[in-house]
UniProtKB/Swiss-Prot annotation:
Cofactors required: Mg(2+); Mn(2+)
GO cellular component, as recorded: cytosol
Organism, scientific name: Salmonella typhi
EC number(s) per entry: 6.5.1.2
The protein's name in its UniProt record: DNA ligase
């Protein structure tokens, strides 16, 4: 594997982990600033090597999946996020891109508003009556929070006024004013309850209560900033006009909204808001800048995960100085050993900060960090900050070097660092308690075996009490044994046992993904399952045969081959099957027997489609005998190029591969 491939894999794994913590668990471990840094690094690397972009990369999607504790609502119109800029130069570059795409030399009229630091929600009104509400979730599916949203007094249960559409889905931010946040924490300290780190966490925790009566006691509020569904009615043709119409119908809208007719006016708005930020009474982390004209918005369109006509201009992260008192080492699912700085506690932007990730040995070397050093900590709205630099001019005399362990701090196994990789790994595998915990958490996760109710804390206890050593042990658990865990009553224990029983019926692709084979994400697992059809065929495959699977190269093929060559892994798989884990037998499709122009061809989709979603297109292509790959190579037979097709199209043309557009694809699908 090339070094850049390893960097991309590690970055994507890290970002997905933090997206899960932020969007699903409402328990972020890093700051927005650190997440943004990682995302920028990933974008920059993918820009260098667009052929390595994967469909499941965090740059290609929004956010993370919802919890199953709530019912789920599928967004009819996806809830996209915004791209970010962090300085004036980046904003001016964004402004120029917009003007260039519009082929205009005239200034764009921008609508500027506050970037609230709360929880994004959608609220659906039918004939003016509130009928449902949902969180953003993963942008496609969110959690049904209707009962809780109905308790927020700022949100009208019925719109008032004239010309209300038959169906109107408004989008906005639920947040907690500073005074309400302080009162919640004051009450929590007095009663021994949970003290929240910041207003955003408090708002998320309040809104996602299973008991709406608790939500009703929290002083949440709401500002509307956009629209999703619009049926049976009309709205003004400008963004500001729509906000004013929402206000006329009784929906709360921020009064800090301004039209700006030049880039300089936008910058002035940004700096004025930044200056007033401490006195607003609620948290913001930047300003949002949108093209005011809806016609121009439509002309500009979207990229994969964000509109081209809007951007979030984020404030600089806030910084403080403190001392590194120690460095500890944590072990992840794949054995990656991550150094964590233990800091002299310091208040940064209203939050007491006591630790920060140092990523890897290369980062420590880059910083020139030693234990005892005075460092600059940067934080911008999250819980765990980043170490920006070392204050060498104030280095104490008693500092000492940070020594990476030669043995795993958890299990004592040897550690290794493969040449060209940034990560040091424990070689202990499942004998390592830390890896065992993380592997089991991955195994039961929603996108893997999807065991409802089997949370991280339960896994931690099961491993620590030595009830569970391998995934197969999970299916041997009884309600009686689970009842002995902390905060686990008989009913909850039985629910977990029932969920485990339900999870036994899965798919071959989910099962492969759940095994946690290194470098095998959901897309690769699906490709392996589709290509080989059966577990027996996959286990018997050679490295050369594995490389025939679309998107599987020598590195992934080697990891898969080595995994199945390991006797202990085969033993665990045998135990899982013996415990009743199963999936439907494969439906064998002979491409030669399918009367379709796509039969037997390896197809790559690139660019955005306007007539159907990418997932729908993939499903229809596969049904017609095609193999859909994520990157263009000599194995590719056909490339389907949608709007704004980029490097994949260029590579296809370079290799002389047949290229068709979306209209031709639709014609052939109907052939």
């Amino acid at each position: 594997m090339e070094p850049i491939e390893q960097q991309l894999t590690e970055l994507r794994t890290t970002l997905r982990h933090h997206e899960y913590l932020y969007h699903v668990m409402d328990a972020p471990e890093i700051l927005d600033a650190e997440y943004d840094r990682l995302m920028r690094e990933l974008r920059e690397l993918e820009a260098q090597r667009p052929d390595l972009i994967t469909p499941d990369s965090p740059t290609q999607r929004v956010g993370a999946a919802p919890l199953t504790a709530f019912n789920q609502i599928r967004h009819e119109v996806p809830m996209l996020s915004l791209d970010n800029v962090f300085d004036e130069e980046s904003f001016l570059a964004f402004n120029k891109r917009v003007q260039d795409r519009l082929k205009s030399t005239e200034n764009v009229i921008w609508c500027c508003e506050l970037k609230l630091d709360g929880l994004a929600v959608s609220i659906l009104y039918e004939n003016g009556v509130l009928v449902s509400a949902a969180t953003r979730g993963d942008g496609t599916t969110g959690e049904d929070i209707t009962s809780n949203v109905r308790t927020i007094r700022a949100i009208p249960l019925k719109l008032h006024g004239d010309n209300i559409p038959a169906r109107l889905e408004v989008r906005g931010e639920v947040f907690l004013p500073q005074t309400g946040f302080e009162k919640i924490n004051e009450d929590a300290r007095r009663t021994g309850g949970k003290v929240f780190a910041n207003p955003r966490n408090a708002a998320a925790g309040s809104l996602r209560q299973l008991d709406p009566r608790i939500t009703a006691k929290r002083p949440l509020t709401f500002f509307c900033y956009g629209v999703g569904i619009l049926e049976g009615g009309e709205l003004p043709d400008t963004h500001l006009g729509r906000l004013l119409q929402f206000k006329a119908w009784g929906l709360p809208v921020s009064d800090r909204v301004t039209l700006c007719d030049s880039p300089q006016a936008v910058l002035d708005f940004y700096h004025n808001v930044e200056k007033d930020r401490p006195t607003l009474g609620f948290d913001i982390d930047g300003v949002v800048i949108k093209v005011n004209s809806l016609a121009l918005q439509e002309q500009l369109g979207f990229v994969a995960r964000a509109p081209r006509w809007a951007v979030a201009f984020k404030f600089p992260a806030q910084e403080q100085m403190t001392f590194v008192r120690d460095v500890e080492f944590q072990v992840g699912r794949t054995g990656a050993i991550t150094p964590v700085a233990r800091l002299e506690p310091v208040q940064v932007a209203g939050v007491l900060v006591s630790n920060a990730t140092l990523h890897n040995a290369d980062e420590i070397e880059r910083l020139g960090l030693r234990i005892g050093d005075k460092v600059v900590i940067r934080r911008a709205g999250d819980v765990i900050p980043q170490v920006v630099n070392v204050v060498l001019s104030e280095r104490p005399e008693e500092t000492r070097p940070i020594v990476f362990p030669t043995h795993c701090p958890v299990c004592g196994s040897d550690v290794e660092r493969v040449e060209g990789e940034a990560v040091t790994r424990c070689t202990g595998g499942l004998i390592c308690g830390a890896q065992r915990k993380e592997s089991l958490k991955h195994f039961v996760s929603r996108r893997a075996m999807d065991v409802d109710g089997m949370g991280d804390k339960i896994i931690d206890q099961l491993v620590e009490r030595e009830y569970v050593h391998t995934p197969a042990d999970l299916f041997r658990l009884t309600a009686g044994k689970l009842t002995g865990l902390d905060r686990m009553g008989p009913k909850s224990a039985q629910n977990v046992v029932n969920a485990l029983e339900k999870a036994k019926a899965t798919t071959f692709a989910r099962f492969l993904y759940a095994l946690g084979i290194r470098e095998v994400g959901e897309a690769t697992a699906a490709g392996l399952a589709a290509y080989f059809g059966t577990l027996e065929a996959l286990q018997a495959a050679t490295i050369d045969e594995l490389q025939k699977v679309p998107d599987v190269g020598i590195v992934v093929a080697t990891h898969v081959f080595n995994f199945f060559a390991e006797e202990s892994n085969r033993d665990v798989i045998g135990q899982l099957l013996a415990e009743g884990v199963h999936w439907p037998a494969p439906v064998v499709i002979n491409a030669q027997e399918i009367d379709s122009p796509f039969a037997g061809k390896t197809v790559v989709l690139t660019g955005s489609l306007s007539q159907m979603s990418r997932d729908d297109a993939k499903a229809r292509l596969v049904a017609l005998g095609a193999k859909v790959a994520g990157s263009v190579s000599k194995k590719t037979d056909l490339v389907i190029a949608g709007e704004a097709a980029g490097s994949k199209l260029a590579k296809a043309q370079e290799l002389g591969i047949t290229v068709i557009d979306e209209a031709e694809m639709i014609r052939l699908l109907g052939a």
